[in-house]
């Protein structure tokens, strides 16, 4: 069966190769998409039982029951979307398994009326690992946020263009299977390119360009995007001029958020902030969510349920005596609220009675 599915996938890829590639959406098409879609308000998910995205997807780690319970929490808040990081390493090990797990994820999200934004690649690291490995993952390090997070596909593959043919197959296979899937509302091709890459940053940017090219060859009905996450002109000239809709990350207080938001809105395309919520920095729900609501800019906070990733702590910094406030997340591991007032503000924004 596995061989048959792989063979079928190869046949579909061959058909795609004969099709005319798509182009960046026109301004008119992007604006029409924005008018046809709701105000998106949701969250980034690392399930509480997972320390990283290998843990989320690999055999023995993928946990439908955990997902179902967390999606119920999100649905009860009125959230209508979720952003989830995929992991190339799991796909490479067994494409059939990965695609089935992803399909199950989409089913569960759909049951909770959540649209999905998959993230295909990611350069971020906050602990020692620069490349993902299968099997048992590292345990959380007390006092260190996202200690066990790993990039996808990993810095070694990003820097080695000889491996990019394998990455092309992954991108095209995943998108092809869901190119017209209404459960997916945006394809986020690459999270925070060049993050922690140092002298290898140019390789990240080269891969970003390839990702857009590969995805355009599939020509999905959903928009493509890569976020604006810092002030690096070299990065932003690529991502803001290639994306069909504009996405950005902002962990600043209200004044800084309004400034970045204004710059993004001026580009004339639909805009979604796909990462925010940094309570110690004043980027909190009482001050920031109303800004996104009043402007109609989409909002996706970082974190729903706190867990092994320890995203309540500062990332990449050892803080053994941390006393809060939490950086990210809305619920403790037992699903009790961190701050009931935050939940009330979210429900007001989403229209939940």
Give, region by region, the residue ranges found by the protein language model:
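Positively charged n-region of N-terminal signal peptides that target proteins for export
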Residues: 1-4
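Active-site mouth of glycoside hydrolases
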Residues: 21-243, 249, 254, 267, ...
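Catalytic domains of carbohydrate-active enzymes that cleave complex glycans
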Residues: 348-353
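Aromatic/acidic polysaccharide-binding cleft in carbohydrate-active enzymes
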Residues: 289-334
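Conserved Rossmann-like nucleotide-binding pocket used by diverse enzymes
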Residues: 39, 272, 300
């Amino acid at each position: 069966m596995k061989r048959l599915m792989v063979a079928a996938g190869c046949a579909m890829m061959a058909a795609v190769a004969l099709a005319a590639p798509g182009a960046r959406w026109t301004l008119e098409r992007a604006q029409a998409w924005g008018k046809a879609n709701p105000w998106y308000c949701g969250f980034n998910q690392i399930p509480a039982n997972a320390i990283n995205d290998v843990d989320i997807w690999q055999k023995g780690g993928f946990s439908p029951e955990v997902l179902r319970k967390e999606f119920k929490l999100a649905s009860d808040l009125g959230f209508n979307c979720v952003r989830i990081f995929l992991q190339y390493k799991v796909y490479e090990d067994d494409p059939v398994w990965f695609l089935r797990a992803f399909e199950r994820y989409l089913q569960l999200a759909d049951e909770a009326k959540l649209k999905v934004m998959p993230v295909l690649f990611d350069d971020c690291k906050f602990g020692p690992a620069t490349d993902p490995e299968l099997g048992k993952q590292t345990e959380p390090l007390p006092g260190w946020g996202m200690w066990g997070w790993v990039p996808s596909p990993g810095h070694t593959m990003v820097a080695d263009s000889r491996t990019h043919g394998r990455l092309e197959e992954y991108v095209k296979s995943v998108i092809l299977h869901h190119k017209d899937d209404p459960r997916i509302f945006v394809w986020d091709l690459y999270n925070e390119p060049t993050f922690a890459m140092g002298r290898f940053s140019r390789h990240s940017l080269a891969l970003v360009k390839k990702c857009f090219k590969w995805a355009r060859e599939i020509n999905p009905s959903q928009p493509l995007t890569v976020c604006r996450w810092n002030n690096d002109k070299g990065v932003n000239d690529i991502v803001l001029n290639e994306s069909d809709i504009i996405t950005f990350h902002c962990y600043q207080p209200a004044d800084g958020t309004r400034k970045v938001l204004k710059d993004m809105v001026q580009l004339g395309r639909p805009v979604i902030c796909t990462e925010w919520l940094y309570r110690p920095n004043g980027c909190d729900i009482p001050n920031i969510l109303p800004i996104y609501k009043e402007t109609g800019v989409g909002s996706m906070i970082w974190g729903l349920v706190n867990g092994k990733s320890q995203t309540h702590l500062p990332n990449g910094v050892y803080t053994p005596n941390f006393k809060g406030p939490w950086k990210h997340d809305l619920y403790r591991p037992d699903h009790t609220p961190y701050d009931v007032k935050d939940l009330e503000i979210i429900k007001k924004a989403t229209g939940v009675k």
